[in-house]
Curated annotation (Swiss-Prot):
GO terms for cellular component: cytosol. The gene is glyQ. This is Glycine--tRNA ligase alpha subunit. Its EC number is 6.1.1.14. The keyword Ligase applies. It comes from Streptococcus uberis (strain ATCC BAA-854 / 0140J). PANTHER family: GLYCINE--TRNA LIGASE, CHLOROPLASTIC_MITOCHONDRIAL 2 (PTHR30075:SF2), GLYCYL-TRNA SYNTHETASE (PTHR30075).
Amino acid sequence: MSKKLTFQEIILTLQQFWNDKGCMLMQAYDNEKGAGTMSPYTFLRAIGPEPWNAAYVEPSRRPADGRYGENPNRLYQHHQFQVVMKPSPSNIQELYLESLEKLGINPLEHDIRFVEDNWENPSTGSAGLGWEVWLDGMEITQFTYFQQVGGLATQPVTSEVTYGLERLASYIQEVDSVYDIEWSPGVKYGEIFLQPEYEHSKYSFEISDQVMLLENFEKFEKEASRALEEGLVHPAYDYVLKCSHTFNLLDARGAVSVTERAGYIARIRNLARLVAKTFVAERRKLGYPLLDEATRVELLKEETE
């Protein structure tokens, strides 16, 4: 690697690459979430028959992973670059390796391994065949073929590529701490995110109001159900995301027991499944508008027979 790309140049390079491969460039979704997979641009669009190709950066919050800014690689919030393609291209792995070349990483000169790591997200009823991608001994990407999302089988199969941007940037810039990553010329990652990391960690582990969070979970759960009763998928899913983040805050605070934890996850999963089922039903009412006309007519005909 000759030129060491800044963090924002890595994002720009990936955006340009996947744009050229036919992906829409979406923007980060404005609700807290633990992973890019939970964005409606993946969770909802991975189900149903309509094609969908999108790429976006997603800040991902994981309260239990906060370390007050003292750990060089573990963060309350990190950034993922998410690529989702449906139906999955037959050459998706080759496209991924090509994207690494655009970042200055020649696959022929590095030890790049696809290590089997089947993926599951119990809180959304989602699972798939997956691999971790290791670059010279460090995991930089999660690669998944979705089999189930929101409790529904995915057909056609959706492929997901999730780059861990901090890890990728640490490797490209040859730094040991994420806080030393150059975000833009002359500006370090730590100058932007070290204080928020400390403050969010302190809040998550020490300050958050457990009673308020428990009450909020109940309110968000009820509101999600109420929205679903009206067939309002997207507002309902917003409240599912709020339930998920609230649960993660409770979990980080140690406010839920092992038994209670399983119960909360099941409650979120039940809502997510209802959202998924309702979304597909609503898209069908619209006549699956993203399908080409011939496929759309044939599919609607089959479903009415």
